[in-house]
Amino acid sequence: MNNIVKIPQIITILSEHSSEHKFGFNSDIFEANVINILLLLFGLIYVLKQFLGSSLNARQIKVLAAIQESEERLEQASARLSESEKQLAQTQIIIDQIKKEAQLTAGKVRSSILAQGQLDIERLAITGKSNIETAEKQIRRQIQQQITFLALKRVTLQLENQMSSEMQLRIIDNNIAKLGDQL
């Protein structure tokens, strides 16, 4: 309400001021063509409203279409992201299973290698023991053969020294008689 009271006061001050300085506000509406100006202004607003309204409507439709397209792309991207997250989770599960299987397989292989190594060690120990026993038997045989050879040599030398030609003839005759009895 204060503004309405002030407007006539402002108009009065301007009209008084204009008469003194040759510039001012003409308060006669018909003389100042205020009605024509108002009609022109309302006509412009009406025409511009229709023109700008159609432009704004077209712009609004484009903006809404762009927003809808963006929302659709967002939904598609969200769906792809969700699918990718599912695939990542499945891949992670598969990776974990592969790791577990690899650990189990590595444990089995390690156990198998250790068991095979233990068997190889036992077999080598048995083979080594067998080789040692065989070597001992061969050495004993060689020693026995050497002892037998040396004993025979000694006996032969003693017999040659102690045996006379008469004893030799008796042994030969005795052997011939034994052979004759067998035939």
Curated annotation (Swiss-Prot):
It is found in: Plastid, Chloroplast thylakoid membrane. Its main location: plastid. CDD domains: ATP-synt_Fo_b (cd06503). Pfam families: ATP-synt_B. The chain crosses the membrane at residues 28-48. GO terms for molecular function: ATP binding; proton-transporting ATP synthase activity, rotational mechanism. Disulfide bonds: none annotated. One of its GO terms (cellular component) is chloroplast thylakoid membrane. Keywords: ATP synthesis, ATP-binding, CF(0), Chloroplast, Hydrogen ion transport, Ion transport, Membrane, Nucleotide-binding, Plastid, Thylakoid, Transmembrane, Transmembrane helix, Transport. Coiled coil: none annotated. It is a single-pass membrane protein. In plastids the F-type ATPase is also known as CF(1)CF(0). Belongs to the ATPase B chain family. F(1)F(0) ATP synthase produces ATP from ADP in the presence of a proton or sodium gradient. F-type ATPases consist of two structural domains, F(1) containing the extramembraneous catalytic core and F(0) containing the membrane proton channel, linked together by a central stalk and a peripheral stalk. During catalysis, ATP synthesis in the catalytic domain of F(1) is coupled via a rotary mechanism of the central stalk subunits to proton translocation. F-type ATPases have 2 components, F(1) - the catalytic core - and F(0) - the membrane proton channel. F(1) has five subunits: alpha(3), beta(3), gamma(1), delta(1), epsilon(1). F(0) has four main subunits: a(1), b(1), b'(1) and c(10-14). The alpha and beta chains form an alternating ring which encloses part of the gamma chain. F(1) is attached to F(0) by a central stalk formed by the gamma and epsilon chains, while a peripheral stalk is formed by the delta, b and b' chains. This is ATP synthase subunit b, chloroplastic. It comes from Pyropia yezoensis (Susabi-nori).
